Amino acid sequence: MQKLLASTALVLALSLPVMAQDYTPDPAAKQGGEITVTYHDDVATLDPAIGYDWQNWSMIKSLFDGLMDYVPGTTTLRPGLAESYDVSKDGKTFTFHLRKGVKFTNGRAMTADDVKYSLDRVTNPKTQSPGAGFFGSIKGYEAMATGSATNLEGVKVVDPLTVEITLNRPDATFLQVMALNFSYIVPKEAVEASGADFGKHPVGTGAFKMTDWTLGQQIVFERNADYWRKGEPYLDKITFQVGQEPVVALLRLQKGEIDIPGDGIPPAKFTEVMGDPAQAALVVSQASLQTGYITMNLNMPPFDKLEVREAVNMAINKERVTQIINGRAKPTGQVLPPGMPGYDPAFKGFAYDPDGARALLAKAGFPDGFETQLFVYNTDPNPRIAQAIQQDLAKIGIKASLQSLAQANVIQAGGEPASAAMIWSGGMAWAADFPDPSDFFGPILSCQSGGPGGWNWAHYCNKDLDAAAQAADAMTAPEQTADRMKAWSGIMAKVMADAPWVPVFNESRYTMHSPRLGGANELYADPVATPINFDYIYVK
């Protein structure tokens, strides 16, 4: 990430056009073929402005494109729908030059008007996008966020193939934001025709188009013959079957009936799979920029009291929790995961101390504890982890009833101001949208992200830290990189002083695929948030 920041800052200084980086195709890749992927839950939405979980992230990526992209399987930025861009000397104005001949899957040509519409839409509070806060550096964002404007002042259409975006401050993460799903381009007429159901009737410029969605059964993607990246994708068809228990999906993979169990390897079967050389050869693993955590809703007493939140942090036996998932994770006491710029290996956080936790509860006025609810995603191992958390809380007098729900229901409850007192994030644990510490603050801990539909499930707001985050991200020069990371380490330490979360563990990513599939391992465990890059895998 430091190399990316340095190269971006150099571009800002020189104001040179940046051309697309080459991707070397796999020489063994073949065109054609169909695959089947399974999931336990149906997908909540395929609207890029709304979808924000590990399940729909890679699916949305295959249906839509943004101005920027990543070289497949890497953290290296490359232009997407913009074939090049220029940056002003002050680093605040980006001029994107769009590719000619790009079409939406409804047949219409994409233009700069679509870029303007898409960015206006994602930042409009009526859309309730959980990613709206990512665009806070664009001029006019605050007016959009408060409802006093209906379009972003800083986004201008220059001509049909040129769009100019002006920022209100230099932003070291801006090009990465332009590669996020939230920045993907959508056609106005399709959104208006479908209304709130656009996520069920997606129209984009991506490598695939959706041809069927039978709720509770399957979603079908077919190759977009007009895709602007010639020769891609390799697959003709992907069928996503839903309602599949992970253990059953693994059995079907072993029988050759499916190609990818989307929910990964069931923890109860992990030792068995890894102990069988034939099955272990099909496993792809990668350290993930991910943190699993418990949120405490500061809008819901008694979690408005710091001593209560500190007590909960001290009550959780994280070593025991990691054993539930066969040691595929390491306990943590901080927000940022190892490997993320700004991670502080010396920061330990709250130690496991049930006696100290009980003393803090008594100090807060709850010597006998209290009753609350803990929400959890209902697929294994999350209910078992939640039970372990429940037991730890009971030891200090907190009686937490478990609310085991479908993923979409947990996400909905978390986004409401006073619905979910506590949430175990497992299955929805925060994984990096891009490799920068700001991504572990803006969308999940900033004041803006605590609004309706957001992912700040603690509804935590520290305006001083919001200001510090903006100041850190204004450091765009190469010589400021170390200072910027130091600033972010300090911000995260102050977050933990407020204790809105219990960071529990950092988990490695494990997935499997059938032996008939090809493609580099990095495509099945993509390092930039997309679990699987469907655009580049293939049938042998």
Region spans (language model):
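Aromatic- and charge-enriched surface segment that lines or borders ligand/interaction sites
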Residues: 83-131, 164, 252, 302
